[in-house]
C-alpha cells in the first residue's frame, strides 16, 4: 500500500485493499441502532451483533457476514452517502466529509492499541441481544456522537 494513501486519493479511487484498511476495527458499526419512529433519529446502543467478538472487536466470521442471517450491511464507495449513522470517528465517514483521520487510527499508529487505549472501540463494552430485555435501556448516546 502507498504510504498515507488516504490523504492522496478519494474514496472512489482506492483499491479494495486500501478501502478495507480504512476500517479501524472499533466495532461501533456492529452495534444495533434504534430509530425514533417520529423523528427518524438514530440512537446507538451497546447491543452487539451476535457475530461480534467483544474482546477483539472483530466479526467471528467476517467472510460470511453478509449471509449469516444478521443484518450486516455492506459499506461501499457507491453507497457511503446512505450511511449517515456511521460514528463520527469512522474513517469512511471522515474521509467522505474531507476530514482527517484521528491520531489514534491504526493507519497512523500502526496498531489498534492506541484506539483501544483512547476508548474508541467497543472492546468489553457490549452486551448481546439474547441478554437484553428493554432495548431502550441500552441506548448509549445521542445520535451522531462518537
From Swiss-Prot:
Cited NCBIfam families: PRK05170.1-5 (NF003501), PRK05170.2-1 (NF003503), PRK05170.2-5 (NF003507)
InterPro entries: Puta_zinc/iron-chelating_dom (IPR005358), UCP006173 (IPR008228)
Pfam families: CxxCxxCC
HAMAP family: UPF0260
The protein, known as: UPF0260 protein VF_1660
Similarity section: Belongs to the UPF0260 family.
